[in-house]
């Protein structure tokens, strides 16, 4: 029986993964080694019971008593805290979904790779912060990383069986978010609720706001660089409001391979779960005649400066991605809290990158996880200072 673990089980990606696993037979088809979640211990316990999980872990130690009570008599072991989540990744599983949001997903993802199995990676921050280290760890341990972002899953599928030296360009698409038709002045005064109103995808608060600011697409550009190894000049993003084409790959013979699919994360998750084969996934089938038109346009970097910052990070490499992601997370925290404006987020990130760029770690290829975490700490501190300064000026 195939074994699996789901890290970030109670988030949107985790819920979709759980849905697909249950549809494929649940505990009759899979041995669930570990499930992890956050504060929603009732849902985590419900999932653990349904899958007969061996271990359920909440990231918050104060939630452990509630989780223990919810799983009493189930036979499922319980634990709490970030260290417990990392230790859960030490339990070997054939297939692990890494869906913890943010840099917190890096440590368990790295530890899971050391078992030489398959890691379905929805946590884009892992590649952004420590891409070279992550890919090297996978190679050294004979592990496989499958991208679960819809764009990178699309590129992965388009490249299947292809000679990558013949790839001229990789194009990932962006919906443009809720502000694609707003003026710069309108965007400047937007609220958290408005930033969360994504036109095509159903996502959590943080990723919805990242999408609105195009920081999500900026992370994905860096992720493309780190996962596939293409030079920055071969990677670009275009705005595609319909969210039907997820990525395109252009080849040296002039041909372009495009991957089309519904705006449903279960497609990419299902591909990773069924890989190396394919299996039925309960998503809507495209009716191209009904869709009728697919449009594309260049993104406006004045309104979405995160894309420009991403190109600078792709060129610098080293630990610049760790600094970028850390600063972005702090800037997002401050926007959600109402301390800074929407457009201030990019300014905070740029100021933080400038502040830490002189540090010897900034351009260094990471050799240890500790170096990644050290740069993460430096950038968070710099971003806090930049955000606090802007808050005082409001």
Curated annotation (Swiss-Prot):
**Names of required cofactors:** Mg(2+); Mn(2+)
Q: Kindly list the positions annotated as binding 1-deoxy-D-xylulose 5-phosphate.
A: 124, 150-151, 175, 198, 211, 216-217, 220
Could you cite one Gene Ontology molecular function of this protein? manganese ion binding
Binding residues annotated for Mn(2+), in chain numbering = 149, 151, 220
**Alphabetical UniProt keywords:** Isoprene biosynthesis, Manganese, Metal-binding, NADP, Oxidoreductase
Catalyzed reactions per annotation: 2-C-methyl-D-erythritol 4-phosphate + NADP(+) = 1-deoxy-D-xylulose 5-phosphate + NADPH + H(+)
**Protein name from the UniProt record:** 1-deoxy-D-xylulose 5-phosphate reductoisomerase
């Amino acid at each position: 029986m195939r074994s699996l673990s789901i890290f970030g089980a109670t988030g949107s990606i985790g819920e979709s993964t759980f849905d697909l696993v249950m549809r494929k037979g649940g505990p009759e088809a899979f041995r669930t080694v570990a499930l992890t979640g956050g504060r929603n211990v009732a849902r985590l316990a419900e999932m653990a019971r349904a899958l007969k999980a061996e271990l359920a872990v909440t990231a918050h130690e104060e939630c452990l008593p509630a989780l223990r009570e919810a799983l009493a008599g189930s036979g499922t072991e319980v634990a709490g805290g970030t260290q417990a989540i990392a230790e859960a990744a030490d339990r070997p599983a054939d297939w692990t979904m890494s869906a913890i949001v943010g840099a917190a997903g890096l440590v368990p993802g790295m530890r899971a790779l050391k078992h030489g199995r398959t890691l379905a990676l929805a946590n884009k921050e892992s590649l952004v912060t420590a891409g070279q280290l992550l890919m090297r760890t996978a190679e050294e341990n004979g592990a496989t990383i499958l991208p679960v972002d819809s764009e990178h899953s699309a590129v992965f599928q388009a490249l299947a069986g292809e000679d990558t030296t013949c790839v001229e360009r990789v194009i990932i698409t962006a919906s443009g978010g809720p502000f694609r038709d707003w003026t710069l002045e309108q965007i400047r005064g937007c609220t958290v609720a408005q930033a969360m109103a994504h036109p095509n995808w159903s996502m959590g608060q943080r990723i919805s706001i990242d999408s609105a600011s195009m920081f999500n697409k900026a992370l994905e550009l860096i992720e493309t660089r780190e996962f596939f190894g293409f030079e920055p000049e071969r990677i670009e993003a275009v705005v595609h409001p319909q969210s039907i084409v997820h990525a395109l790959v252009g080849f040296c013979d002039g041909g372009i391979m495009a991957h089309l699919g519904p705006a449903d994360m279960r497609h990419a998750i299902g591909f990773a779960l069924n890989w190396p084969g394919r299996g039925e996934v309960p998503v809507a089938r495209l009716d191209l005649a009904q869709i009728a038109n697919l449009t594309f346009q260049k993104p406006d970097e004045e309104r979405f400066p995160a894309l420009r910052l991403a190109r600078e990070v792709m060129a610098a490499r080293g630990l610049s991605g760790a600094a970028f992601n850390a600063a972005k997370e702090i800037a997002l925290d401050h926007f959600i809290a109402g301390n800074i404006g929407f457009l201030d987020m990019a300014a905070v990130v740029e100021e933080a990158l400038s502040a830490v760029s002189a540090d010897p770690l900034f351009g260094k290829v990471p050799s240890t996880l500790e170096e990644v975490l050290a740069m993460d700490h430096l950038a968070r501190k710099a971003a806090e200072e930049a955000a606090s300064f802007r808050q005082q000026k409001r």
